[in-house]
Amino acid sequence: MSDLTTIARPYAKAAFDFAVEKQQLGHWSQMLAFTAEVAKNEQMHELLTSSGSANKLAEIFIAVCGEQLDGHGQNLIKVMAENGRLLAIPALYEHFAVLKQEHEKKVDVEVISATELSEQQRSEIGSKLEQRLERKVQLNCSVDETLLGGVIIRAGDLVIDNSARGRLKRLSDALQS
């Protein structure tokens, strides 16, 4: 999968730069999200891995997407088909979404807690993270009762483990060393 990510990066960057230039970031995001779902479809995946001609594959892919693709989106599909890169479309969308979030100064944050967080707790966590990360934060909260207490917060590469389970593990590691 990392190969597809590497392949997708320049396409995602080009699509992102074009979308920013044309002030169509939302439109391109929706269009690429749709194409990623089409590419993930089992039957489409089988077709894309077949040895069909690039033009035929692009034609079929564009036909399946229908009006969800504008002319520029169709051109992207044609170029990717010519280069044998249609399987990288889901990775292209993922990278595009990351670029979009960076551009909009937003970040998705996963908050895992031992119990359901109150609205006040969510608000406090959100505001503290916005200050620390200097970005608009979108919290995605879930409950994992095995934490015993506390929370684990993941925002990109940042991981804050303030769970009772995490603290017990760190204590155990310290005692064993």
Swiss-Prot record:
Membrane topology: Peripheral membrane protein
Biological process per Gene Ontology, one example term: proton motive force-driven ATP synthesis
Keyword vocabulary terms for this entry: ATP synthesis, Cell inner membrane, Cell membrane, CF(1), Hydrogen ion transport, Ion transport, Membrane, Transport
Signal sequence extent: none
PROSITE patterns: ATPASE_DELTA
GO MF annotation: an example: proton-transporting ATP synthase activity, rotational mechanism
Gene Ontology CC annotations of this record: plasma membrane; proton-transporting ATP synthase complex
Family: Belongs to the ATPase delta chain family.
Subunit field text: F-type ATPases have 2 components, F(1) - the catalytic core - and F(0) - the membrane proton channel. F(1) has five subunits: alpha(3), beta(3), gamma(1), delta(1), epsilon(1). F(0) has three main subunits: a(1), b(2) and c(10-14). The alpha and beta chains form an alternating ring which encloses part of the gamma chain. F(1) is attached to F(0) by a central stalk formed by the gamma and epsilon chains, while a peripheral stalk is formed by the delta and b chains.
Listed name of the protein: ATP synthase subunit delta
Source organism of this protein record: Vibrio cholerae serotype O1 (strain ATCC 39315 / El Tor Inaba N16961)
Gene name, Swiss-Prot/TrEMBL: atpH
